[in-house]
Design a protein with these regions (language model features):
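A short helix->beta-strand "capping" segment at the edge of beta-propeller domains
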Residues: 35-54
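Surface-exposed loop and turn segments in beta-propeller and other repeat-based domains
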Residues: 45-49, 87-101, 140-154, 193-198, ...
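Beta-strand-rich domains and repeat architectures in extracellular enzymes and scaffolds
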Residues: 48-73, 104
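Repeated scaffold domains used in trafficking and secretory/extracellular systems
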Residues: 54-61, 98-107, 150-161, 198-206, ...
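Short loop/turn segments immediately following the C-termini of beta-strands
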Residues: 72, 120-122, 171-175, 217-219, ...
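Structural motif
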Residues: 74-79, 124-132, 176-181, 220-227, ...
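Blade-loop segments of beta-propeller domains
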Residues: 85-119
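Loop/turn-rich, solvent-exposed surfaces of beta-rich toroidal or solenoidal domains
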Residues: 197-230
């Protein structure tokens, strides 16, 4: 019986590997003619398919050692060097929130061993909250904080922790004109910061070196990365990714390379919505 089970398991693993390889070829062919980014260059790209896709289709953050991913209802943890997922939590939305209608995990941010997740309901987006997970285990800590509806009328697609200021930022999804600033400990609103220009369809954001970087899913396919001065609200284009209108931009994170320079890691859903890509960029000279 054991030998038979072992044989079946080996065959199953080989079949899964073959299917994954075929899917990687297909999604690679879909994206082979993507124009080069403007203002940055691609370092590498990791593609996730099959089961891993459902762990990586929404948000990403990092703590310098690991990536933390979100799918619509799942969480994943990966080695920051290889991108290989080694820990998951499925059905990560707590039961008490599901009973209230929450059904979608969006962008992530993390600090001090806690992953902060933007979670919303749908399709009317009547409720939004920040849910706290343990970064080691990816388990719910028992803490969540509802967000004010008048500042999140289209849900909360992302959140970003500012460790230096002890803040957490959010914004409206469509044509956001202000940055919402909450106290990291209490999630009470501190202030709003007017932005120098609207930012549309922000899907993820992360702080790096005192600046807030945003990944936007503009429908024209440019998919800009914006840099926001959180003191003045000034918004500038950091670089343009040019991944195409068929690709859906998702979350992003930033970490420092061995020289202290930023590495931008941007998550996308493939044109067929059967794969996700984590692309690493460095700014052009």
């Amino acid at each position: 019986m054991t030998a038979t089970f072992g044989t079946i398991y080996v065959i199953f693993k080989k079949c899964v590997s073959l299917i994954a390889a075929i899917m990687l070829l297909v999604v690679g062919a879909d994206e082979k003619n993507t124009p080069a980014p403007v203002g940055a260059e691609v370092i590498s790209k990791d593609t996730y398919v099959l089961y891993d896709y459902h762990m990586t289709s929404q948000g990403v953050t990092n703590d310098g050692e690991f990536f933390y991913f979100s799918g619509k209802k799942n969480l994943g943890k990966a080695d920051i060097e290889t991108g290989e997922i080694f820990r998951i939590t499925t059905n990560a939305i707590p039961d008490e929130l599901e009973e209230m209608g929450y059904d979608h995990i969006g962008g992530l941010s993390c600090c001090d061993g806690i992953v902060y997740a933007a979670v919303e309901d749908g399709p009317d987006y009547e409720r939004s909250c920040i849910v706290l997970y343990d970064a080691e285990t990816l388990k719910y800590t028992g803490k969540y904080y509802p967000l004010p509806y008048d500042l999140h009328k289209e849900g909360v697609p992302w959140c970003a922790v500012d460790v230096e200021k002890n803040y957490i930022y959010t914004a409206e999804w469509t044509n956001a004109t202000v940055l919402n600033v909450f106290d990291l400990d209490t999630l009470e609103l501190v202030k709003t910061i007017p932005l120098s220009q609207p930012v549309d369809r922000v899907q993820g954001a992360e702080m790096f070196d005192g600046k807030l970087y945003m990944s936007c899913d503009e429908l024209d396919g440019n998919k800009h990365i914006y840099c926001v001065d959180v003191e003045s609200g000034d918004v500038q284009v950091s670089f343009t990714r040019n991944v195409g209108a068929e690709i859906e931009a998702e979350g992003m994170t930033v970490y420092a390379d061995e020289n202290g320079e930023p590495v931008f890691c941007v998550l996308d859903r493939g044109a067929r919505r059967k794969s996700s890509n984590l692309t690493r960029y460095r700014l052009a000279d």
